[in-house]
From Swiss-Prot:
Lineage of the species this protein comes from: Bacteria, Pseudomonadati, Pseudomonadota, Betaproteobacteria, Neisseriales
Protein name from the UniProt record: Ribosomal RNA large subunit methyltransferase H
Gene label: rlmH
Organism superkingdom: Bacteria
Any single Pfam family the record assigns to this protein: SPOUT_MTase
Enzyme Commission identifier(s): 2.1.1.177
Family from the record: Belongs to the RNA methyltransferase RlmH family.
Taxonomic source organism: Neisseria gonorrhoeae (strain NCCP11945)
Main location: cytoplasm
The reaction(s) this protein catalyses: pseudouridine(1915) in 23S rRNA + S-adenosyl-L-methionine = N(3)-methylpseudouridine(1915) in 23S rRNA + S-adenosyl-L-homocysteine + H(+)
Gene3D superfamilies referenced in this protein's UniProt entry, alphabetically: 3.40.1280.10
GO terms under cellular component: cytoplasm
GO terms, molecular function: rRNA (pseudouridine-N3-)-methyltransferase activity
Residue numbers binding S-adenosyl-L-methionine: L73, G104, L123, S124, S125, L126, T127, L128
């Protein structure tokens, strides 16, 4: 199973990179995990939020693996349990889907990009910093994969 996370933003704190790398390493042969950073559009000097999101959308669309099942993280998305996320991964794996999760920029994502997604998901009702979202998403994806492989990492 191939899992790609596209995250708008660069230059995360070291603890974010280290935590993501730790969970990514734990996937082992159970899933191929990749995090790709998308350059954020600079705001100000004549570039407003709408223009910035449009520029980021273009970069995101170029980075989505061809034919991938697109999941965008959005505050209005569904918040699955860890077991439900594992069931989604199981279904995508059985269908041979490459799954691509998108974490938008500071201003979010365009409506057009959200409409292209086959699923909208949220990690929490709280507003979270982007670095924390990277870590939480990667950990939850690892947890879901570990559930599918009956690994003792997840406990009910």
């Amino acid at each position: 199973m191939n899992i790609t996370v596209l995250a708008v933003g660069t230059k995360m704190p070291r603890w974010v990179d280290e935590a993501v790398a730790e969970y990514a390493k734990r996937f082992g042969r159970d899933a191929a995990y990749a995090l790709k950073e998308i350059k954020p559009e600079k705001r100000g000097a004549g570039v407003n939020a709408v223009q910035g999101m449009a520029a980021e959308e273009k970069r995101i669309l170029e980075a989505i693996p061809q034919g991938a099942f697109l999941v965008v993280l959005d505050e209005r998305g569904k918040a699955p349990t860890s077991v439900e996320l594992a069931e989604h991964l199981k279904s995508w794996r059985q269908n041979g889907e490459h799954v691509c999760f998108v974490i938008g920029g500071a201003d979010g994502m365009t409506d057009r990009l959200k409409q292209q997604a086959r699923m909208m998901m949220r990690l929490s009702s709280l507003t979270l910093p982007h670095g924390m979202v990277r870590v939480l998403l990667t950990e939850q994806l690892y947890r879901a994969v570990s559930i599918l492989h009956n690994h003792p990492y997840h406990r009910e």
